[in-house]
Amino acid sequence: MWEKCHRQWHKIKFYVKHAHLGLLPPAWLAKSAAAELERFERAPAELRAAIENRVHYYNALSQPFFLPETAPRVCHFPRQKPSSYYYDLKALLRYFPLEQRFSAQFGDVTTIPELPQFVKSRPITKNNENAVLLKLDSVRHFYLYPDRLPFRAKKSQLVWRGAAHQNHRIRFLEHFHQHPLCDVGCIHARSAAKPYHREFMSVKRQLQYRYILSLEGNDVATNLKWIMASNSLCLMPAPRYETWMMEGRLQAGVHYVQLRDDFADLEEQILFFERYPEAAEAIIKNAQQWMSQFARPETELWTALLVMKKYFSLLEPQ
């Protein structure tokens, strides 16, 4: 009951905070990026350097570019679905001139756009600079549940729940749904007749396990953020997609335990960390520290505004 209320309150706060963005005229919503970034300039040098490093990772553009005349403008950006993407982007666009043009792509972005666009996700690959990352759909992807249970007090199994539509998820479940070290299953109704079908399991219950699997779906795995913020150990194959969390910068053996793409080493990895729990706790500490950089609203705003400022500085006027 507490978890359901916690998640619902998280959503309610987001939509109440942002509802006016879809109702009021853009001119009434306008704020000044320059004024906000003056506060950034007064921040400690070490913090400014860390933020600037993130900015150039999210926005790797280095050459001027054009957008078509049909590209939307800040003053003409009507409400769109999914609304969570719209609200996150609108909350940032309000800091820039009303006539400023931009381009954005909502949803799971798994290819590189032809023209520079603001996106939630992108492939981890070279030459992905046209996919400029922002913290979009944050209400879903940055939902974190408090975990007060120490690693050694948790169940010594690996847990996973989700929808298994993709081949790699199905293959995993076919191989491990009966494994004694695993409590894994597909919760989607379409899998009801499959031997790997399981009932829904809340985040709170999943956090009672020492090991939690993060499996990418169409793009990034939604559970990766809350796993890495918890006292459980994240196991996953090397990520192929990234978001504001900078999954492409995560280091195997430092922030998470990397599995082979065929999961053949899953049992070996679990047994290793059962023998050496201090090694698991060291990785968990690093993961929590990684997640801490996304926790301060002021820092997150400065970072996003600088990402957008760089984008607009390279956009050629018509």
From Swiss-Prot:
General function of this protein: Involved in lipopolysaccharide core biosynthesis.
Protein's organism: Dichelobacter nodosus (Bacteroides nodosus)
GO molecular function: glycosyltransferase activity
Pfam families the record matches: Glyco_transf_90
Taxonomic superkingdom: Bacteria
Entry EC no(s): 2.4.1.-
Official protein name in the record: O-glucosyltransferase LpsA
Originating gene: lpsA
Listed InterPro entries: CAP10, O-Glucosyltr/Glycosyltrsf_90
